[in-house]
Every structure is written in C-alpha cells, then in structure tokens.
Amino acid sequence: MVPMKIVSGTYGGRPLKTLEGKITRPTSDKVRGAMFNMIGPYFDGGRVLDLYAGSGGLSIEAVSRGMSEAVLVERDRRAQEILAANIAMTKEKERFQLLKMEAKQALGLLTGTFDLVFLDPPYAKEEIVRDIETLCERQLLSENIMIVCETDKHVELPEEIGQVGIWKEKIYGISKVTVYVR
C-alpha cells in the first residue's frame, strides 16, 4: 500500500496510518487533494462530520485546512485504533471526537449542525441516500452545508435528496466524488 499523508494545511506532510485489508478503503492522497480543491480548498472554521471515518484522512485533512473540529464515526475496532493514532499525530486531540459505533446509531445521537459532511460508506447508494435523509430530518445540516460523497464511478446518486441537491460531480480514476449543497 502506498504511504498516505495529509496533503495541505496545518498538518500538511504528516504521515497517516492506514488499515491493511478490506475493512476500509482509504481515499488516496491524489483524490483527497482533488476533492478539497473542489470544495475549498481552505476553510474558516466550521464543524465536520465523517460518518464512515476509516483512517480519518478526510476529516483530519479538513481540520488541517481550517475546520474548527471534527466528529469521526467508525464501527470497526481495528480502524478505531488507527484513527486514534492518526488523531494523536495532529497533537490537537481536543479538536476531534471519535464515536465508536455504527453510522446509523451515531445519527440518532448527534446534536448541533455540521458545515461539511463526508460520506464514503461500504454500500454506497442506499446508505448515502438514507444518511442524507436522516441528516436533513434531524436538522443536523447548517445553511451552508457541503456533503461530499465518494463512490465507485458507476454509482448514480439522485439529483436531490431531502433539502440538498448535487452541486458538483467529478470522476477520479475508479472513484466518483459528488458534492451536495442546499
């Protein structure tokens, strides 16, 4: 596996640990960099939610680029250990909250609003639609929300889900990045 690192910002260049195997599919540095160029590339505060955090690369990158804090959700115990190590690497653990549970359970417990949400679930389309509907129903999205979904390039997501619609969509190799906004 290619070594991964934070692409830019405060933590730029720092290495990220990843989990070997099929439990998580880390977003490559190239796709992550392109993804942030689509939506940013830098932020002035805000709250980020990563519902299928894996190694935490996306939310750690977002905080590195100016988000104030991140909530990372991960159910797999081995991935949680990698996540904890990657959060410790930032030396700013207080900016990250790790919820060790299923995404569906976390969605029932979360409070406040989020400005940026990352969705990269294992069963893309059905889970993305369900998760966005729940985020809208529970009023967890800020007015300026950006929801970034990473799927296989062949997955077709709906134009609109709840109160959000597709703003941008781009294919990078075998991955497709879809961004929803209000």
Where are these regions (language model features)?
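Class I S-adenosyl-L-methionine-dependent methyltransferase catalytic core
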Residues: 1-182
